[in-house]
Curated annotation (Swiss-Prot):
It is found in: Cytoplasm. NCBIfam families: PRK01117.1, purA. It catalyses: IMP + L-aspartate + GTP = N(6)-(1,2-dicarboxyethyl)-AMP + GDP + phosphate + 2 H(+). This is Adenylosuccinate synthetase. It comes from Bifidobacterium longum (strain NCC 2705).
Amino acid sequence: MPGIVLIGAQWGDEGKGKATDLIGTKVDYVARFNGGNNAGHSVVVGDESYALHLLPSGIINPNLTPVIGNGVVVDPEVLFEEIDGLESRGIDCSHLKVSEAAHIIAPYHRTLDKVTERFLGKHKIGTTGRGIGPAYADKINRVGIRVHDLFNADHLHDKVEASLHQKNQMLVKLYNRRPIDVDQTTEELLKLGERLKPYVANTGLILNKALDEGKTVLFEGAQATMLDVDHGTYPFVTSSNPTAGGACTGTGVGPTRITRVVGVSKAYVTRVGEGPFPTELLDESGEWLRQQGHEFGVTTGRPRRCGWFDAVVNRYASQVNGLTDIVLTKLDVLAGLKEIPICVAYDVDGERHDDMPTDQAAFAAAKPIYETMPGWDEDISNCHSFDELPATCQAYVKRLEELSGCRISAIGTGPQRDHVIQINSLVD
């Protein structure tokens, strides 16, 4: 049975949670493979809306096993807050599996994230201040703390001491802050480890055995393609690999086990934080999209930057991820527009670029080249097949598919779980 990767094809907030939940009804395991609690996603079930930041969105489904892979950085405090919140609403979380090799976000990572961002001033990246970057930096610098380190007091103390040696020097001498106490930090982490222990497992082994047994595994990426530390709009990116390749390194499953790569794209584009955004709308059209689409961050509450659909970005996402399918979300938001622009290429210093510039200075200078499609007025939330959509809406979808270089296999037509038109199966 297949290993299916689900990733964001733009700058995040594309509706991956809803797409994951849709596909998740047909799979046995849902595994997050990157990021931390810096990305939020919402899952709507009936009249209930669940805002998740760290837990896989498949946690809502009692018939599958949710997994947090080794590529995720885990803030235990946030994890327990989410578990407690769900269990208070009757959602059982006891089937959650957390990789013993995942790295921990310690309190000092959050402190450093906030202090460093303020220190950068106008050069800030626009982080959420939740310690994600510093935790990944420790991982690369080989001074990180893994989940299994929380179960050995002496070993943990040594690792915390090693990690804080340089950080305390920076806090005191560079940022004029107090040093962080090693003993107190160790005690706090040991207590968190006690509660975390029942969920901890060798998740790489679990997922590989599941695939060997013919189970279907969905690999759920946080953030999105354009925020990938290698393939995104560097340096305005996250600290991990949300692209399809990250599913393998972030779970311990080999690339030959992946049979389908599904990208999620909004029918328009949004972005949170700093960085270039060629189709961004700074006028009333952008505010209209923001209000119609309720474009405010799940994690931070920040208003999202909004713009028209960027086909150059989607073609790039298709290439980088090897997309087999696209799930197009929030098509309903565009109802009421007389005309809908689509960015088909860029103008960079007078030259047309049909593909993504590798030079970020060129990308920052890119001006969108638009073609315009007629809009529609009808409410499409009750449409259950592609043929039921208004003719101009169908034409818009077909044009996006053509420009993206990948088939559109499902369409989101509203906020509810059943507001979806399935065109092609994403599992078979």
